[in-house]
Design a protein with these regions (language model features):
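A structural boundary/capping signal
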Residues: 1-255
Length: 255
């Protein structure tokens, strides 16, 4: 996970996106080996190369969305496994961002640049082909979004960096794990988000809740204290101070 942490802290972006996404999947699958899934991506890239007489975009479309039937998992959208690259490769179902990573990484193996586009609410990929620009909705069977430039603020059509993609994935998992009260996994996600942005007050408050649920009372106290430093005018500050006092008592009782 050290390589993942370096990306999030702006220290190093040399790790390929597929490896970074698989490392992130270890929150859900702690013993996940990377090599078999990287090999599967290699295999799919070779299959697309075999079809590339028709150009990468057409070959990738026919192979991924035709032969393999990759598609969006609309029936179980908020399953955390949709954010795990290994699970998406196995089930051929996922959410926009993980399906986009599959597309981006297959293209990279063939020397083709494909950008991830962080459109609001729906991640897309963008490819240049024969002088034309195509926005592809991998969640909807590779549909070409001809309308996107007229509908979306140009600021959201700037390609996402690797770090931005990982943070977006982490934010997806944050919501899911908090809603499911999967406190260990939520805390792991929030640790990474706070590495990326130590001043994320909301993440601090959420991690405090996760830590308290895990009986890590002193650590929860620390997070709430930092939260109040960042948000001194929070309307609920008196209640939060009472929570801190209560957590300190619980920590003292525990020890």
């Amino acid at each position: 996970m050290d390589a993942l942490r370096r990306i999030l802290q702006h220290e190093d972006e040399s790790l390929p996106l597929d490896e970074a996404a698989l490392l992130l999947a270890r929150i859900e699958y702690p013993d996940l080996p990377l090599a078999p899934w990287l090999a599967e991506l290699d295999f799919h890239a070779r299959q697309i190369r075999r079809l590339s007489l028709y150009g990468f975009r057409n070959a990738a479309h026919n192979y991924l969305f035709g032969e393999l039937a990759f598609s969006g998992n609309g029936d179980d959208y908020y399953n955390p496994r949709n954010s795990c690259l290994n699970s998406v490769l196995e089930s051929r179902r996922g959410i926009p961002i993980t399906l986009s990573i599959v597309y981006i990484e297959l293209a990279r193996r063939l020397g083709i640049t494909v950008d991830g586009i962080p459109a609001p609410g729906h991640f897309l990929v963008r490819i240049e082909d024969d002088g034309d620009t195509y926005y592809i909705d991998v969640f909807n069977n590779g549909k070409i979004r001809d309308d996107i430039e007229g509908e979306v603020d140009p600021r959201f059509l700037v390609p996402a960096t690797k770090r931005m993609i990982l943070i977006r994935m982490l934010n997806n998992l944050r919501l899911i794990y908090l809603q499911r009260q999967a406190w260990h996994k939520a805390a792991a996600v929030l640790d990474l988000l706070l590495l990326a942005d130590p001043g994320d007050a909301d993440a601090l408050r959420q991690r405090a809740a996760a830590r308290a649920a895990l009986h890590h009372y002193q650590a929860a106290c620390s997070d709430l204290s930092r939260y109040l430093t960042l948000r001194p005018l929070d309307p609920g500050k008196d209640e939060l101070k009472a929570q801190i006092s209560n957590l300190r008592r619980m920590h003292a009782h525990k020890h």
